[in-house]
Design a protein with these regions (language model features):
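Bacterial N-terminal signal peptides that target proteins for export
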Residues: 1-12
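Extended, small/polar residue-biased N-terminal targeting/export presequences
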Residues: 31-117, 165, 171-194, 415-425
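Terminal peptide-recognition signature
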Residues: 41, 105, 125, 133-136, ...
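C-terminal functional modules
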Residues: 388, 396-429
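Gly/Ser/Thr-rich loop/hinge elements
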Residues: 190-191, 244-300, 336-340
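C-terminal, low-ordered peptide segments at domain boundaries
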Residues: 137-233, 286-287
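PDZ/PDZ-like domain segments forming the peptide/carboxylate-binding groove
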Residues: 96-138, 142-146, 207, 214-218
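N-terminal signal peptide c-region/cleavage motif recognized by signal peptidases
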Residues: 21-23
Length: 429
């Protein structure tokens, strides 16, 4: 979740998954030299960072870059990737336009395999014939097992620059092997990829596959909810399985569309900052939306990639309606960032935590599923035979899981691979 102060180019970023606007008192660096940037990061971190008391006393001038300095001072027990520094232009493109430079696919890595989870429309990957469920065998002449074993898989597709060419060998689900060459360009991620209505035993059940909480999401969600209201939907399955979070303002909009009249004006979340910034603490509330649904409960599909603003939706609605989780445990990110633009970069330090109307919010272990289900990549998203959606529809129809969910672990479990910065929300190449 993100927010940002006005001085840092008020950009509405309420995300990481909870982004918000940076405090108005933030000033830019004295210079854009390496030492100037590092000193700027020190000044911001020692003021707004949620765990500022844990920052070690290291000389920022000794570090080669602000990224290296930030990595050295972050509070690693809880902040291994959340606070970040990134390129200012690409950060803005993602949050304002839902765009990034790449080939347009997201993947999962298990053991020595890379599988395709999603291919974005009108992307180089789609044009090359890649699809959900395909196995990527080689990237630029190197086998995927070798790339994984040597820790080189993250950079295997090359830099995020327009014109970079990538050679990919993949095998489709029928067993056919194909070699393609794709060229990176600007790719747009649809924030709402699917809106469906299923008729199950006389019930109208709505389904929304929601990919990220960015500015274009507001219009896309309004369109989706208008369709569901017109169809007379009385139940909703919200698919957040690959949604790593985004803007808090978008989470507020979505929560209000789901909560409807029963949550209107109620507390959605309360901000808590460190003691130096307690004056910034405030409460945001559910709003009135003419296209809101009238729901008695919400069913959410999640995986370990569901984080931040996705988890905020679950936590914020639970005081007012049952929120049932199908799939896997969520990531566990109950903290948010303000974003500060400086020179050609953006700094997003963990700055606050959010709690719901019952004061609940420390979900660093994530939320456990009520009904366990696999992310079934053998079937398309939105297909009623896909395991997670099938389980969600079963839960709505019968009131029970098809099989018991596993017991929640008693101690923090580290989730799977997660990139730093806005790239963790894209989770794509």
């Amino acid at each position: 979740m993100r927010t940002r102060p006005r001085r840092a180019r008020l950009f509405l970023l309420c995300l990481l998954a909870w982004l918000a606007a940076p405090p108005a008192s933030a000033q830019g660096p004295a210079s854009c030299t390496p030492s100037g940037k590092n000193l700027y990061v020190r000044d911001r971190m020692t003021d707004i960072y949620f765990w500022y008391r844990e920052i070690p006393n290291l000389d920022p001038v000794r570090f080669d870059s602000p990224e290296a300095y930030l990595d050295a001072i972050r509070y690693r027990p809880l902040d291994s990737t959340y606070s970040y520094i990134t390129d200012r232009a690409s950060n803005a493109a993602f949050f304002s336009e839902s765009q990034f430079i790449g080939i347009g696919l997201s993947t999962s890595i298990a053991s020595d395999q890379m599988r395709v989870l999603q291919v974005f429309p009108d992307s180089p990957a789609e044009e090359a014939g890649l699809a959900r469920g395909d196995s990527i065998i080689e990237i630029n002449g190197r086998s995927v097992p070798d790339l994984i074993a040597t820790g080189a898989i993250d950079g295997a597709f090359g830099p995020a620059e327009v014109g970079v060419q990538v050679s990919i060998v993949f095998r489709n689900q029928a067993g056919g092997r194909t070699t393609v060459n794709v060229t990176k360009r600007l790719v747009t991620i649809p924030t709402v990829s699917l809106t469906r209505v299923y008729d199950v035993a006389g019930r109208k059940i709505g389904y929304i596959f929601f990919r990220n909480f960015v500015q274009p999401s507001v219009a896309a969600l309004d369109t989706a909810f208008n369709e569901l209201v017109a169809a007379g939907v009385t139940e909703l399955v919200l698919d957040l399985r690959y949604n790593g979070g985004g803007l808090i303002s978008v989470a507020q909009h979505l929560g209000s569309l789901i909560g409807g009249m029963q949550t209107e004006g109620q507390p959605l979340a309360e901000y808590f900052h460190n003691d130096r910034n307690a004056f910034r603490n405030r409460t945001i509330r559910f709003e009135s939306k003419p296209n809101a649904l009238r729901l008695e409960r919400l069913v959410v599909i999640t995986t370990r990639s569901s984080a931040s603003a996705s988890e905020l939706i679950i936590n914020a609605l639970r005081p007012f309606m049952p929120v049932l989780i199908v799939g896997d445990r969520t990531y566990g990110k109950p903290v948010g960032q303000y974003q500060y633009d400086f020179c050609d970069k953006t700094l997003a330090p963990v700055s606050f935590t959010l709690r719901n109307a019952r004061g609940e919010g420390d979900f660093f272990d994530g939320f456990a599923p009520d009904c366990a289900a696999a992310d079934d990549i053998a079937h398309p998203l939105g297909d009623t035979l896909e395991s997670s959606l099938r389980e969600a529809l079963t839960l709505i129809h019968t009131g029970a899981c098809s099989a018991p969910a596993p017991l929640a672990p008693r101690s923090r479990v580290e989730p799977g691979r997660r990139a730093a910065g806005w790239q963790s929300l894209v989770n794509a190449y």
